[in-house]
């Protein structure tokens, strides 16, 4: 009955908080963001091998989504237990952990793309294809660590913390 490794929804308008489990089987979610379509992107730091980005398309289904930990790290099976963790959601993107450590993500409605970064300075941009698959369309490496993103919706500028780098992104 532990809440470890889970993402919860809490209705703060109720006198008694009863957590609604949205997802479980998560190792170390450093970044979580919800887009204008109520989809949740989860950046899950791996243990030894894989950094993974997950997409939950329906936050209100009432059925928790299984992301696979501790049997899976991303899409890689790390434990052999056929009874544990059936129906595991596959990540929309993953990469080898060295170097890595996912820290920040931001869905960009204007260009229908997901921007994310890791602590070691790599910024990546994903785009969804018509068949639903996601693919990497851009990767940029900078010298400094990245802790988070901020979007100025009026100017459409993206700011990167902690160094206040400004990004301008367009997808043709």
Task: Walk through the language-model features, giving the residues of each.
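Beta-propeller domain segments
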Residues: 1-135
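Short coil-to-beta transitions that initiate beta-strands within beta-rich domains
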Residues: 98-103, 141-147
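C-terminal, surface-exposed recognition/capping segments
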Residues: 125, 139, 147-153
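Blade-level signature of beta-propeller repeat domains, shared across WD40, Kelch, NHL, RCC1
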Residues: 148-172
